[in-house]
Every structure is written in structure tokens, then in C-alpha cells.
């Protein structure tokens, strides 16, 4: 459901007055939380300096064999992100990369990009947007989404969450509905095409929307230590301000799968691997040095920017993901701050397929019903700019390309 706001400054002033009144001790509470964030940032930077993983690295073979060690699981819950090695065979991923390149070239996508619809979602981020293409229905994307391996990885990630709490069952972790997303094809030498640090999945809604306030109920009550980023209570119930390219599904993790080798310096992903970072962002906006009608620069219908002026302790922990090989995947909690490097200083393309992890729930089922006609017609999905590039593309995936699992994940029903 959409969450409309008629007078944003008035809504912010009213909400902040209520939230501040409910937490008269917000200043010392925030100082304690800021100390926790600083300690986590120090640990992350120490790990990086000493050559240890700043982002937990798992092997898909261990997930498949149910032998991921408890220390890795604990690190994943603390850092809010992970790399999964070998979800796909490297040759398979490289072949998919070649197939997508041929699909793009055969259908003259570059000629059509000049007429693409405006993607306003990233408009306020410092460095424009990376080279992300409105391609959703290529056969490699369909094959990857419906693959048993990536499905098993997504179910594993879903199960890291508390799917039942507050006396309710919030979602079915065993289901992995397909959220159709785009591809990135970033050539070497490209610059000023990154994304500055931000969070997806809601900006001003995190303070203004009632269910989002319930998500952060412990934080807003001053008990941030009781806040569990992996408690799913109320998350599938949140409502977003209507906007192109704002995700309408509840994702347990955002993610992408590498199609080419890439790593630090290759114009790829950076993370602030702090799972409880949003507690800091939420409380920061309620401090007395922030104007009454401002939420640290948050804008409706946009990515939630994390800015040096307001969030410097968090930004200290921004680190690159480790080197990735074709077939590896990276996933990060929806509240984890992420960015994309401005410059690609490497020698090869940094190409990925965006494939997130999402569970079965009413919110996601409702989106599948809206997304399915887009697939059948080859149109851009409802959440994305209405480019509709693929309607007449040769080689586009069709319903016949779906496996039984793929049909279920797309919402075809029995």
C-alpha cells in the first residue's frame, strides 16, 4: 500500500515532536549508541588493516551441506552482510555474461538508452548512478533466479531472520519469490558513475510511517540494545511513499551475483558492515541540533543518504567488498549502508545481476501479481522506470523458459 504525505515539513515537525517527547533522555541514549558504532567501526578497520575479512565470507558448499559454522553466522548477524563463494560455477556465470552481452547488442539496447525513462530514485546521491541497465527478462537472469542453488542460498538468508515474534508469523522463509531487477555492466575506465553511501527501502518513512516506527520500537523507546535488526516484526507491513524504483517487496537481503571478476578499485560495491546502523540513523535525526522539519536530509521517494554532516561515525566504517569471481554472490541486510565506487580503475568489465533475497508474505505475493503481467509482456516491472525496452527483444525469456520452481517464484500458482 502507498503511504501518501500531503505536507512533508508539517508531518516531520509533528512526528519529531512526539518522538522527542517520548524520549527526554535521547541525548545520553544517542551518545551511548554512538560509542557502540565507533567501537564497531574500529573493529572493522582493524580487521581490514590486519588482512581479515571485514565482510563474512561463506562457501555455498557449506550452505548446501548445512555446515556453516556458528562463528560465521554470528559475524553475519553483526556485520549484516556476507559474500557467498561459488553459488554458480565460474564458467556458467561467464557464459551468462556473454549471453547478456549478445542479447544487449543484438537488440541494440545502447541506441534505446538515449530514450530511457528518468530514474529519480538516485537523483540526490552525490555521483549520479552507475551503469545499470533496464534489462529484467534475459534468459540468464531467469535461469539464475530460478536456479536451485541460488534459491537455497536465499532460503538460508531468509532463515537468519526471526520470522515469528510478537505473537505473529511474519513470513515463510522457505519460499523465495523472484523480484525481477536489473543488470550492471560497467566498463573499465568509467568514472563519476558511482553511488554515494545510502540505504534503500524507505527514507522519511522510517520515522513517519507507523509500521516503520514499530520496526524501530526499541530504538525509539531509548532501548537500542534490545533492537534486533533481524526481527521481522512489522517489516512486511511497512508502506512506502509512491515513487519509481522504490522497492515494493520486503527483502531480507539485497544482493547481486558476479558475472565477471571484480573487487576493490573496480568500480564496485562498498558496505558499512554494521547491522544496527539504522538505529544510529534513526536516533541521529531526533537530536536537538537537527532542525525540527528535517530528518538529516532525508527526501521522500529517494534513497536515504548517509551524509558526512550527520553520520560521520558510520562513514568511517565504509569498506570495499572482497575480490569476487564469476558465480560468487554478495548480500547485505536492507538496513545496511552501501555505496558504489566512483571510478573503475580495473582492466575488465564489472558486471552483475541484481538478485535479492525475499521471503513469502502477503506483501510480496501482492507484488508478484503486479509483476507477472510485466514478465509476460516483456515490460519493465512495476517498481522500475517504465522503459519497457524488452517488449520486442529477440531472445527474451518467456513462460516456457520457467521451471516448475521458477513458475512458483514468479507467482503463477499451482
Tell me what each language-model feature is.
Residues 1-78, 395-414:
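Fe(II)/2-oxoglutarate
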Residues 2-5, 9, 285-414:
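Conserved double-stranded beta-helix
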Residues 17, 24, 42, 46-49, ...:
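Generic surface-pattern signal
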Residues 18, 22, 36, 99, ...:
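Residues that form generic nucleotide/phosphate-binding pockets
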Residues 56-64, 89, 199-201, 359:
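Helix N-cap / beta->alpha transition motif
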Residues 71, 76-79, 88-322, 341-347, ...:
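Non-heme Fe(II) oxygenase catalytic core, chiefly the N-lobe of the double-stranded beta-helix
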Residues 82:
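Beta-strand-loop-alpha-helix segment that lines the small-molecule cofactor/substrate pocket
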Amino acid at each position: 500500500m502507498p503511504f501518501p504525505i500531503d505536507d512533508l515539513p508539517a508531518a516531520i515537525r509533528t512526528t519529531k515532536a512526539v518522538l522527542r517527547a517520548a524520549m527526554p533522555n535521547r541525548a545520553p541514549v544517542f551518545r551511548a549508541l554512538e560509542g557502540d558504532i565507533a567501537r564497531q567501526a574500529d573493529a572493522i578497520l582493524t580487521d581490514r588493516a590486519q588482512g581479515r575479512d571485514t565482510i563474512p565470507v561463506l562457501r555455498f558448499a557449506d550452505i548446501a551441506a548445512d555446515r556453516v559454522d556458528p562463528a560465521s553466522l554470528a559475524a553475519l548477524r553483526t556485520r549484516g552482510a556476507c559474500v557467498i563463494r561459488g553459488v554458480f560455477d565460474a564458467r556458467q556465470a561467464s557464459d551468462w555474461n556473454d549471453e547478456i552481452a549478445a542479447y544487449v547488442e543484438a537488440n541494440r539496447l545502447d541506441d534505446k538508452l538515449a530514450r530511457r525513462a528518468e530514474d529519480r530514485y538516485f537523483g540526490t546521491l552525490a555521483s549520479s548512478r552507475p551503469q545499470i541497465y533496464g534489462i529484467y527478462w534475459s534468459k540468464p537472469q531467469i535461469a539464475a533466479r530460478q536456479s536451485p542453488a541460488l534459491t537455497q542460498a536465499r532460503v538460508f538468508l531468509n532463515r537468519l531472520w526471526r520470522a515469528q515474534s510478537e505473537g505473529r508469523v511474519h513470513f515463510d522463509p522457505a519460499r523465495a519469490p523472484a523480484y525481477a531487477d536489473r543488470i550492471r555492466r560497467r566498463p573499465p575506465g568509467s568514472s563519476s558513475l558511482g553511488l554515494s553511501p545510502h540505504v534503500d527501502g524507505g527514507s522519511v518513512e522510517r520515522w513517519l510511517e507507523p509500521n516503520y516506527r514499530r520496526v524501530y520500537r526499541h530504538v525509539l523507546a531509548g532501548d537500542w540494545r534490545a533492537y534486533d535488526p533481524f526481527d521481522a516484526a512489522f517489516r512486511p507491513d511497512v508502506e512506502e511513499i509512491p515513487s519509481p524504483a522504490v522497492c515494493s517487496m520486503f527483502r531480507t537481503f539485497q544482493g547481486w551475483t558476479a558475472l565477471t571478476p571484480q573487487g576493490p578499485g573496480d568500480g564496485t560495491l562498498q558496505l558499512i558492515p554494521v547491522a544496527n546502523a539504522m538505529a544510529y540513523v534513526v536516533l541521529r535525526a531526533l537530536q536537538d541540533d537537527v532542525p525540527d522539519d528535517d530528518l538529516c536530509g532525508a527526501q521522500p521517494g529517494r534513497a536515504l543518504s548517509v551524509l558526512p554532516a550527520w553520520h560521520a561515525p558510520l562513514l568511517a566504517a565504509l569498506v570495499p567488498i572482497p575480490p569476487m569471481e564469476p558465480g560468487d554472490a554478495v548480500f547485505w541486510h536492507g538496513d545496511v549502508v552501501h555505496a558504489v565506487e566512483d571510478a573503475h580503475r580495473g582492466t575488465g568489465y564489472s558486471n552483475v545481476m541484481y538478485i535479492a533475497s525475499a521471503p513469502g508474505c502477503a506483501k510480496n505475493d501482492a507484488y508478484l501479481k503486479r509483476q507477472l503481467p510485466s514478465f509476460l509482456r516483456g515490460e519493465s516491472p512495476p517498481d522500475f522506470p517504465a522503459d519497457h525496452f524488452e517488449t520486442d527483444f529477440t531472445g527474451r525469456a518467456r513462460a516456457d523458459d520457467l521451471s516448475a520452481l521458477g513458475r512458483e517464484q514468479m507467482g503463477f500458482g499451482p
